[in-house]
Amino acid sequence: MKNQLLDAKVASEEQETVLRPSLLNDFIGQNQMKSNLTIFITSSIERDESLDHTLLHGPPGLGKTSIAQIIAKEKNVNLKSTAGPILSKAADLAAILTNLQKNDVLFIDEIHRLNIHVEEILYSAMEDFSLDIMIGEGPSARSVKIYLPKFTLIGATTRLGLISKPLCDRFGIHLKLNFYSCEELTQIVERGAKVLNVALDTNAAIEIANRSRGTPRIALRLLKRVRDFGIYQNINPLNQQITDYALNQLGIDKLGLDSSDHKYLRFIAENYDGGPVGIDTIAAALSEQRDTIEEMIEPYLIQIGFVQRTQRGRVITANALKHLH
């Protein structure tokens, strides 16, 4: 199982509230996306209209939820949040939509996991800002059209390919979030340290950033765990030595890989001479769900050039073999 410290899907309540940036100017990284979004938001405010429906996609932990909250804050409108798996019935979505006010933001996380019947309700809501509701049953049932105030739907997904084309095409704005650079993560760690009232030197911040898999959520989680080691050993401010020790104790190597990553790489290296090998074979051998491997393990390994996805299966690179040895 993936080390929860490196699981970008796991977020603490503290991170959700205290450590999130509240405005675009506070948001570190994703500069091209941020620049475009500033233009879109400013234009919508000048026109006194809702922002076009927006689809945010990219690996977990990169700031999709934060962006949704920032959009609502910048627009000075209400934000309603839910998630694809929660909306099991069309009535669930209809109840949310009918309570929206003009220009409000509805954020649906994991939108690729929407029930197809719920998704179909969204089509007219997104295009025409209306709902067709069936009242009654049997021969006496009739359809009633309910008109909605203009709103902005923000969908977030880690699996863009799983979103149906009809739904995808209804988003006027598509924004991709990429992994962060070490420099950007260092700034995020330093900002997080100030918010948490943690003293640390630059080398400690860089060490945490280097091991954070390009992901702010992981960087902030590691910062808090290093803080714990510093308190236990009475080290203040946090320095590179205690940071290195803490992260080693947590099973996180210099590149941010944990035992699950090493197990994945070694399986391919030792059993298939570096690959190719099919994803289902890997999942069975590691006793992991295919989705877990594709969402939590592979993206970063591909990003750092350790794994290649080919038509014949997964292949690990010479750099990966060098790192293992």
From Swiss-Prot:
The keyword RNA-binding does not apply. Residues 181-251 are annotated as: Small ATPAse domain (RuvB-S). Keywords: ATP-binding, Cytoplasm, DNA damage, DNA recombination, DNA repair, DNA-binding, Hydrolase, Nucleotide-binding. Mg(2+) binds at T65. It is an enzyme of class 3 (hydrolase). Residues 254-325 are annotated as: Head domain (RuvB-H). One of its GO terms (biological process) is DNA repair. It is found in: Cytoplasm. Pfam families: AAA_lid_4, RuvB_C, RuvB_N. It catalyses: ATP + H2O = ADP + phosphate + H(+). This is Holliday junction branch migration complex subunit RuvB. It comes from Orientia tsutsugamushi (strain Boryong) (Rickettsia tsutsugamushi).
